[in-house]
Amino acid sequence: FRCALPISLGRTDEPPILLRAHDTDCKMVMDAALPLYKNLYTMHKYNGESLTTYEPRGPWSKIHSDLSALGSIHISNVHILANLEPWRWGSPDFVQKAVNAMHNVHGANALHLYPQASYWDWPYTADKLPDGKREYQLDRDWIWYKTWGRYAWNCHRDRSSEVEYWDKQLGDFYGTTPAEAGDILEAYEQSGEIAPKLLRRFGITEGNRQTLLLGM
């Protein structure tokens, strides 16, 4: 194992290998492999296959903290989020708090981000445009990628300064006054809590099989 993979690729270094917790016994693999191969990473889904909270706790969080203690970099995976489909979603405050939780509660130091919706249709959304063309996810869900990218890079940003930043971003995007942009940001922040709170109250089972979602 130590030599075969790099040699077969014609490399003298150790290429990165990622262990995904939902299909691998990471502890068993890490205990056996780390003494031989150092460039290993672990990854686990942040809230599962839904976005439910920026205050994670319980058995799911323990999986993260256990993985982050194994001796390599742990990656938080924002997976296919069934409870956000098919709507548009963007809450800078929620995302900043979630990334802080990834660091402080789960011990993660990297992010693997999936599209906000329509993963299997990438790069297109499910939206129908008037001219019949398909809309790109990077255009429709720009705030999704911008928030996660911004706070994955640095989640320790002053909140009041962030409000000013997002007011400017939204004002430029929608062509509004600063006051109107502030109202749009507030709408994003308030609506961003709805799907996570509903699932925390009524969801049964984890993943894209949730009773709440199957009934919608």
PLM region descriptions:
Residues 167-174, 179-216:
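C-terminal functional modules
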Residues 1-178, 185:
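Catalytic-core regions of glycoside hydrolase
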